[in-house]
């Protein structure tokens, strides 16, 4: 298996050179004119920070919404699930940020998107300093907009083999420079097929090994949620844009429980765990853009939000353990950006400011009051341009971050330089190098001072003394984009110095306390490759990808290493009104701290038929699998060794029907492009 994967990697690395012979089709097609690299007949244009993708007419016609379109683009190193409505990196490469005409897009925005109005997609796999830490990919979908007319539509997705679905209704009305849009989404899930199993080996203080198994025998997982959004925008295509967006969302998980059998060789016990919650979150987003002459522009954005969360936890293993959480979070985020398109480069500079207040009160068997305040001021500047065959992007960001919680507080500065150089070797063949360093901050929840019991032996403990770690990245990639072949190889070496790593502390009472501490370094070396081939242009395309990953976790308490492999592929066929899709990957395996995990493999098949204003699709997930593994993992501590797995009968052979209907009328003009994003307010800080 390993030898085969190495051969696959070498083949991918060789493909860019061999693909240069592909000339006969390129001579007949027109070129795509861009300010970046121009590739004859290619629907993909290489940029310093990623790819500019122009979807084909067949892809637009065959897509029903934003997720459907993204799934057909075979984006490198991403898994797009249009049934579950998720976009996930194939490795731990940071989060994916999706935007619509520059503004951060919600699920509702993507579901109400008309693919036929999409002009291009800016796929950024190398985000600059103006994006927040931890953002690995940015997908900006740019569309046309109607000046007069209306749009009504519905996107209904419901599983027939299990209780799971999401239904969206939307409407837009345009008059001259104004647009009013309404969107309502209802999500539901009520499943009984989730099962977990666990075997733990505890080394006690007296040196004895205490073996325990916990196997789930029954359970129920429910989630009901609604989201309503109203958006007004006023835009003159040449000079200004104003947009106001008010959204209100909420959900609850009533009646969630799981029944287990506990065995330790002498005792067999049945017990139940309960985890129910409800949440409510209103958000107001105000945005303004103004064009100053031909080359300059200013952008401003303010987002205010609040999150109200009530949670109840119960664990019947051993003695009864129950607690409640009353959580409140308020946040305000603002950003301003200045951009000047000079020759031969573009200069951008700006500032971001955010402040949040969190008040989480734990009662019952957990007694804690977490009052946390976080603030950040971030200044950045970036230059991007071209000189002959060389494209470049250089930027620097400086941030002042503050945090306080009762007797704990810190105030520190971070420095984030980033440099990217891109060289055009030949037409369509590019090489790129990126260097970046920044400080990474732990999640809100892990810096609280709460202590939560996981089971009769284990506890999760927050650590308010956690300090930011230093991340250093060196990335090299080479890619080729031709008329029928696109391929590339990405090599990354990442170091996380002074990382917050997992620590298990054994108490005199033989309890095991999990926390995070700054005790070492985590390194990762990754090689990832992909190749896409249009077997029959506009009708049949095939994509293959593979990767080799090496992890190093070195701390003052332990050392863990891992080599893993991931591979997969997809196929798209456009046959008139019919569209056939298939996707498969083997999941991905990693080790971080003392936790080794493997996400389960994914297999999807889909067929859709479009007629007039309607489209009907059928999807099957995890075919021929009764209980597919969703995740496996291990705890590698010297005093606590554990293996666990999660399976789902509901996801096995899951069949989902999707119906889309759209009625529209109007004329289109230049798109709105909003360039500010805010998403830090989504953390609640609840453990």
Go through each PLM region and give its residues.
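Short, acidic, small-residue-rich periplasmic hinge/interaction motif at the N-terminus
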Residues: 21-60, 83-84
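N-terminal periplasmic accessory domains that precede
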Residues: 36, 66-71, 85-88, 108, ...
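Extracytoplasmic beta-strand/coil segments of soluble accessory domains associated
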Residues: 67-103
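Short acidic/polar hinge/loop motifs at secondary-structure boundaries
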Residues: 101-128
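Transmembrane beta-barrel wall of Gram-negative outer-membrane proteins
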Residues: 163-190, 206-256, 280-293, 569
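Face-selective signature of the C-terminal outer-membrane beta-barrel domain
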Residues: 225-251, 274-408, 412-417, 424-428, ...
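Outer membrane beta-barrel strand-and-loop segments of large Gram-negative receptors
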Residues: 331-335, 378, 463, 467, ...
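Outer-membrane beta-barrel signature, preferentially recognizing the C-terminal barrel domain
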Residues: 410, 427-429, 439-488, 495, ...
